[in-house]
Amino acid sequence: KDYRTFLRENVEGIDERYSGGFFVDKLGKRLGQHKGFPFYTIGQRKGLEIALGRPAYVTKINPHKNTVKLGFEDELLCNGMRLSSCKFVDESLMSSPELVVRIRYRGTPYGVRCLVSDEKGMKVILNSSASAVAPGQSAVFYIGNRVVGGGFIESPLSEHEIVC
């Protein structure tokens, strides 16, 4: 089963509740109608049923406005993320040069340049760009094959927030 079928079978009235939203570009211009924001995920390319002249991806979802922002592959990239509920088995491991983070099960491990705690949670600055970092995903920290920490992604960081 695909994700849409699963939702339709398990969430009563989902089509009626969330139909009629719009795909928008990065400036907010309407590009066409979508089938309801719950049916899309950040980074999704297949099943959009809209043509923009080159491959388009879901870059952001606004459930309050029932909009799905579309963009291109480079717009999915970020060099950091903000986490909530971040915990480590030993805080001294947070500064290990061997520390990596994964944002998907069996996903690419990204080297961690630095971690910055503030009143909003934890900023994770990466050594390289990650794609399709989305709120709600888990970020799991490893040293080798050992899980040493984790947290929940609140948002990707913008370029001006990438400061160690």
Question: Regions from the language model: what does each represent?
Answer:
Residues 1-147, 151-164:
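Nucleotide-activated chemistry modules centered on ATP-dependent adenylation/adenylyltransferase
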